[in-house]
Amino acid sequence: MAKSKNHTNHNQNKKAHRNGIKRPQKHRYDSLKYRDAKFRRNQKFANRGTVEAIRQAKASA
């Protein structure tokens, strides 16, 4: 009895290129998910301070 085929790459390249091989989507900001918790907490307070400073600058102008 003949040995069974273990692997073939036939047609895989054609299938892959039918819709084109695309690069991963680039985003403006990377996700903060799984980022260091201490950094995220500090970022939250830093952003809050920035927003308040902008509001005060608009109010005084």
From Swiss-Prot:
- Listed GO cellular component terms? cytosol; cytosolic large ribosomal subunit; nucleolus
According to its UniProt entry, one GO biological process term is: cytoplasmic translation
Q: Name one GO molecular function term.
A: structural constituent of ribosome
Q: Where is the composition biased (Basic residues)?
A: 1-26
Which keywords does this Swiss-Prot/TrEMBL entry list?
Cytoplasm, Nucleus, Ribonucleoprotein, Ribosomal protein
Q: Which InterPro entries match?
A: Ribosomal_eL29
- Main location as per UniProt: cytoplasm
Region annotation (Disordered) ranges: 1-32
> Member of which family?
Belongs to the eukaryotic ribosomal protein eL29 family.
Name it: Large ribosomal subunit protein eL29
Gene name on record?
A: rpl29
